[in-house]
Amino acid sequence: MAAILYIVGSFIPLYLFSDFLQIHIDEIPAFIASFAYGPLMGVVVLVVKTLLKLPFTKTLCVGELADLLYSLVFVIPAAIIYKKNRKFKSAIIGFVVGFVLQIVVSFFFNIFVMIPFYGSIFELPQAFLDAKWTFALSAILPFNVIKNLIVIAITLPTYKSLHRLIDKI
């Protein structure tokens, strides 16, 4: 699963937002692994994917580690909820919980950690740093909502079509 995750980890830019905001569909294999084999497998897949990406980073490793955090917050709650009751309704509830948690964590982590960090490293203008709440509300928040909806929309039918095959393995 980690190898698949690395391969599908291509970026899909949404040109409405900043160029560093790119959709990573690499959460899909992590969801499939965690739904099939439990939350720990989802964690393993995400960590391996991150380790594979670190040597090629352009973000001083910080972007990849933040992406790992956001992905873990999205995948783990969904996997835990689904593991307790392996029904479609549980998957939906898990996706909603993970969705909301990921949005909240990524929003505040960007405001209090990522933007100030990159501001100091790349000497961003003070006006940008002063407008971090506006930037987070107008770019980061809508981007993550769109990204999460795309990931869920692809994961649900993919897992539904694969779960019988996975159960036989």
Enumerate the predicted regions with their spans.
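Loop-helix junctions at membrane interfaces
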Residues: 1-169
